């Protein structure tokens, strides 16, 4: 009797609405799985249409084209003699569901709808889909005629059921269901399901890779069984990077690990495992067996097929492995770089333009492009034909083969230092040296003539000439003079992005990169429509603290000594006049708080969901050894005043790589008003009362608050 099964899961770089490309990647993954002896292939969530279709899920076209792709899969000879588990949207009784469609040899076995939808953070599945709420229940689903013609089936089971083959029992759960308090795998495992599959659409967040691994290993540790997890990978059209990490686990151990960051569009994992190991593991867990004896049965779909062979005694089985994690610095180096690569090749542009200021943020962005170039060269050396074809398209040279990251960087990255009379020689030198070391095409220019021309128009119309504060001007004049410099830099960045390659006789345009970090965005410490306004921002979801650690990491990893002086220099916007040739303005002085403090505020505001009063109470304990209650109160008030005053800037924030759970990104992750009462009278009065109590004073009444 056969008992060893070979199963396959995968990570695919699908693209929203790219039905042609998605089909080819699915077919390739099935072909690879079959060639490795697998008899079951699991793919990512909604892989046929791509996970990130968003409001396109409302369109009948999306449903139609998904079924057309399914038809192409069902009739392909590649899908014969292997159970194929694919994801797509399906409408049943005029209700849209996020489904798995499982088929074998031109027959649909089961359509399994998702039962718990992700609806927090970046996820909005309840906007487009309805969860299937009828546990252990199936209905008849009438197939579209195009599928009936292929399968000769009129109806198939639709609902919460499991598959029974000659040798085992297989159950499905979909992404979010793994994370719920009462996951389907619990009851399925108790009902004798030995192989559980999970198709995911899970994106990367810094320092969170272990969460999925821990959940899967815990699932199979408590209940035994084999667990397959598939995930999407790459940028499928927006701010998220789906980080793969496909895996196969059994009885609390991992047997196959997929890459978290890779330029491979298709990655397939297989493992050969012994079903008797599951049965013997479960046999000695008496608490599990007592619960199983009372379990309600699932509807079973009988499948005339086996995952094992009769003659498998000599077949080698897979061995457990230790999961290998990336450090946060490696995650920053690899994740945004892969996201940038997908964005570049799919946008049909010829490269990037980066305003390089000589500071940490723009230097970190430059390092990400260099990291991307390193990964591209490595992929080409490894024989990745898709990456090679994409590179040749981008540089418009059909015979080009990238071998040196510096050479590739020089072809696809233009850096631009935009000096003014307020810029120091030190930042100019640092920008130039870094550009030389990464190999970018570097431009230095002076914006003073443009600033003078713009201010000349203002003076001509009004008869007034504003002054910097250092020259006796008001704070309003000072800010306006800073902002005009910043906005002219944005205009010039887009001009050079459109025409710099043309001026060099090279085909194409460039994507403009922004370099505002998550902390500055949270506080609004940026000029609206300055160089923070760009096409995309690879560091917009990363904290200043993490960026500094990443830049330090790059010094050794990429041998970029120019970064050392950038790290040592104080962060400054260089928008105010120099004092004796030296920088007179620093970011932290301008903000009135440190970047470390900003990270704390950001996590408490978003992750811990705290308003001003709750944050004050929390920080009293956290900072009790370094701040008095009065100092804590002043810091919290300053943060919320500036945050609310600048919240309107988040509505125009450049699309940024999502990396932190306290991102203020206004598109769908952090939904807040952008017109506040910035004095927060009631909230700040509550804080003041508490401070006075702690200082043993009488609290003020809340009556009559303005």
Curated annotation (Swiss-Prot):
Keyword Iron (UniProt): no
Region of interest (Ligase), residue spans: 325-706
Catalytic residues of the enzyme: 45, 114, 175, 357
Pathway: Cofactor biosynthesis; NAD(+) biosynthesis; NAD(+) from deamido-NAD(+) (L-Gln route): step 1/1
One Gene Ontology term from the biological process aspect of the record: NAD biosynthetic process
InterPro entries: C-N_Hydrolase (IPR003010), C-N_Hydrolase_sf (IPR036526), Gln-dep_NAD_synthase (IPR014445), NAD/GMP_synthase (IPR022310), NAD_synthase (IPR003694), Rossmann-like_a/b/a_fold (IPR014729)
EC number per UniProt: 6.3.5.1
A molecular function GO annotation: glutaminase activity
Reaction equation(s) it catalyzes: deamido-NAD(+) + L-glutamine + ATP + H2O = L-glutamate + AMP + diphosphate + NAD(+) + H(+)
Keywords: ATP-binding, Disease variant, Ligase, NAD, Nucleotide-binding
Gene3D superfamilies, A to Z: Carbon-nitrogen hydrolase, HUPs
Broad EC category: ligase
One of the record's GO cellular component terms: cytosol
Pfam families: CN_hydrolase, NAD_synthase
Protein origin, superkingdom: Eukaryota
NAD keyword on record: yes
Location of the CN hydrolase domain: 5-275
Residues engaged in binding ATP: 355-362
HAMAP family given in the database record: NadE_glutamine_dep
Assembly information from the UniProt record: Homohexamer.
Disease implication from the record: Vertebral, cardiac, renal, and limb defects syndrome 3: An autosomal recessive, lethal disorder characterized by severe cardiac and renal anomalies, including hypoplastic or absent left ventricle, transposition of the great arteries, absent pulmonary trunk, and hypoplastic or absent kidneys. Patients also exhibit vertebral segmentation defects and shortening of the proximal long bones or micromelia. Death occurs in early infancy.
Physiological role: Catalyzes the final step of the nicotinamide adenine dinucleotide (NAD) de novo synthesis pathway, the ATP-dependent amidation of deamido-NAD using L-glutamine as a nitrogen source.
Similarity comment: family membership: In the C-terminal section; belongs to the NAD synthetase family.
Protein name: Glutamine-dependent NAD(+) synthetase
Gene giving rise to this polypeptide: NADSYN1
């Amino acid at each position: 009797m056969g008992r060893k099964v070979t199963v396959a899961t995968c990570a695919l770089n699908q693209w929203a609405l790219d039905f042609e490309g998605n089909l080819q990647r699915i077919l390739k993954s099935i072909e690879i799985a079959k060639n490795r002896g697998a008899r079951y292939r699991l793919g990512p969530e909604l892989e046929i249409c791509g996970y990130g279709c968003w409001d396109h899920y409302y369109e009948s076209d999306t449903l139609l084209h998904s079924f057309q792709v399914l038809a192409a899969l069902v009739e392909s000879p590649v899908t014969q003699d292997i159970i194929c588990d694919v994801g797509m949207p399906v409408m049943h009784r005029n209700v849209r569901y996020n489904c798995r469609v499982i088929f074998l040899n031109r027959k649909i076995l089961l359509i399994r709808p998702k039962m718990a939808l992700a609806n927090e953070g970046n996820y909005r599945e309840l906007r487009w889909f309805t969860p299937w709420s009828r546990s252990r229940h199936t209905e008849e689903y009438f197939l579209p005629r195009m599928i009936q013609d292929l399968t000769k089936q009129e109806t198939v089971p639709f609902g919460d059921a499991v598959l029974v083959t000659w040798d085992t029992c297989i159950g499905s759960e979909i992404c979010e269901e793994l994370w719920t308090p009462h996951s389907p795998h619990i009851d399925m495992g108790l009902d004798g399901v030995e192989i559980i599959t999970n198709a995911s659409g899970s994106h990367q967040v810094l320092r969170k890779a272990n969460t999925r691994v821990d959940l899967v290993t815990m699932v199979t540790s408590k209940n035994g069984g084999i667990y397959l997890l598939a995930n999407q990978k790459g940028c499928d059209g927006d701010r998220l990077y789906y980080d793969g990490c496909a895996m196969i686990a059994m009885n609390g151990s991992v047997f196959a690990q997929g890459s978290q960051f890779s330029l491979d569009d298709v990655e397939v994992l297989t493992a050969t495992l012994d079903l008797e190991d599951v049965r013997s593991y479960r046999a000695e867990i008496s608490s599990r067996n007592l619960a199983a004896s009372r379990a309600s049965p699932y509807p079973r779909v009988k499948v005339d097929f086996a995952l094992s062979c009769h003659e498998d005694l000599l077949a080698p089985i897979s061995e457990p492995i230790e999961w290998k994690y990336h450090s946060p610095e490696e995650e920053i180096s690899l994740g945004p770089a892969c996201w940038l690569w997908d964005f570049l090749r799919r946008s049909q542009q010829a490269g990037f333009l980066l305003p390089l200021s000589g500071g940490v943020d723009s230097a970190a962005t430059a390092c990400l492009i260099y990291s991307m170039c390193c990964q591209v060269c490595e992929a080409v050396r490894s024989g990745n034909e898709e990456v090679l074809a994409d590179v040749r398209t981008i540089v418009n040279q059909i015979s080009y083969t990238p071998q040196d990251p510096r050479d590739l960087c020089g072809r696809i990255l233009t850096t631009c230092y935009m000096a003014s009379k307020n810029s120091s020689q030190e930042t100019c030198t640092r920008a130039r040296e870094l550009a030389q070391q990464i190999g970018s095409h570097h431009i230095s220019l002076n914006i003073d003539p443009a600033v003078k021309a713009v201010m000349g128009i203002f003076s001509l119309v009004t008869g007034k000439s504003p002054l910097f504060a250092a020259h006796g001007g008001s704070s309003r004049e000072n800010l306006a003079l800073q902002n005009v410099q910043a906005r002219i830099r944005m205009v010039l960045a887009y001009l050079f992005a459109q025409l710099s390659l043309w001026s060099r006789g090279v085909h194409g345009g460039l994507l403009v990169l922004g370099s505002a970090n998550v902390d500055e965005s949270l506080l609004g410490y940026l000029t609206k429509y300055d160089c923070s306004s760009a096409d995309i921002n690879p560091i917009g979801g990363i904290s200043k603290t993490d960026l500094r650690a990443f830049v330090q990491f790059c010094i050794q990893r990429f041998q970029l000594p120019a970064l050392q002086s950038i790290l040592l220099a104080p962060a400054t916007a260089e928008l105010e006049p120099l004092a004796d040739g030296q920088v007179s303005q620093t970011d932290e002085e301008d903000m009135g708080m440190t970047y470390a403090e900003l990270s704390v505020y950001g996590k408490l505001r978003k992750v811990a969901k705290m308003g001003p009063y709750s944050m004050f109470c929390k920080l009293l304990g956290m900072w009790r050894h370094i701040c008095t209650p009065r100092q804590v109160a002043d810091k919290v008030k300053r943060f919320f005043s500036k945050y609310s005053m600048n919240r309107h800037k988040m509505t125009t924030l450049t699309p940024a790589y999502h990396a932190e759970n306290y991102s203020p990104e206004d598109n769908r992750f952090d939904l807040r008003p952008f017109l506040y009462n910035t004095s927060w009278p009631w909230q700040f009065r509550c804080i003041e009362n508490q401070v006075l109590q702690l200082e043993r004073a009488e609290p003020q009444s809340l009556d009559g608050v303005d």
